[in-house]
A protein has these predicted regions:
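Conserved segment of the helicase C-terminal RecA-like domain
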Residues: 2-30
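C-terminal accessory/connector segments of nucleic-acid motor ATPases
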Residues: 24-214
Length: 214
């Protein structure tokens, strides 16, 4: 047991069809000897928000060290370029604060990963609130979104999809000054995610037992 594990030497095991670990590999692991990291993935963090062109140019900047490799275009960059092409209906001005806010909104993770249009819609809505007269995502809008997701029926896929959507609003709620009554919505999103996760666990257990029985 765990309480007596220091009394005997352990051993390295494998799973599935993995090949056996040889003595040389065990020694390297035990002594923390690993191959040198020769390349690191890099992206410029010193962004220029003077105007849209400067922002894109600073994101496209290449590293000045041979051992750094520029990251491929990330999702947040793709979303940013979508908005800067004015395909979203938003008029993006060459204003430092607006561009900085837009970039921050574009970094909202796509937890759902089902339809790209849905993610763009979420980013657009959040940016619209933050850059509009409200300056924050309103209580009413947060209530509407969570009400849609506060359903416990459905199969594993539908429950997983709801949890992913709740995580989006949990992320938004945890951003400073993004929502009205932040503490309230942080707590509400956490409770809803926990509730849906418990229900998902029940559904997975039931599915597993049904398969074993058949």
């Amino acid at each position: 047991g765990r309480a007596g594990r220091y009394l005997n030497d352990g051993n390295f095991g494998i799973t599935g069809d993995c090949k056996e670990i040889n003595a040389e590999e065990v020694e390297l692991l035990e002594n923390h000897k690993f191959e040198e990291i020769r390349t690191l993935i890099w992206r410029n963090s010193n962004l220029n928000f003077n105007n849209a062109s400067s922002l894109i140019k600073s994101l496209d900047e290449r590293p000045n060290k041979d051992w750094l490799k520029k990251v491929h275009e990330c999702e947040d960059e793709k979303v940013l370029k979508y908005f800067l092409k004015d395909l979203s209906g938003h008029k993006i001005s060459d204003n430092k604060q607006v561009l900085s806010l837009l970039w921050e909104c574009c970094q909202i993770p796509d937890f759902v990963k089902k339809t790209y249009g849905h993610h763009l819609e979420v980013v657009s809505k959040v940016f619209g609130f933050l850059n509009g007269k409200e300056k924050k995502v309103t209580n009413n809008y947060m209530k509407q979104q969570l009400s849609i997701l506060n359903k416990l029926e459905g199969n594993v896929d539908s429950l997983s999809n709801r949890i992913a959507n709740v995580r989006t609003w949990s992320y938004v709620s945890n951003k400073v000054n993004w929502v009205e009554n932040q503490d309230y919505w942080v707590e509400r999103t956490k409770l809803l995610e926990d509730k849906l996760s418990d229900r998902l666990h029940e559904e997975l257990t039931k599915s597993f037992i049904d398969k074993r029985a058949s």
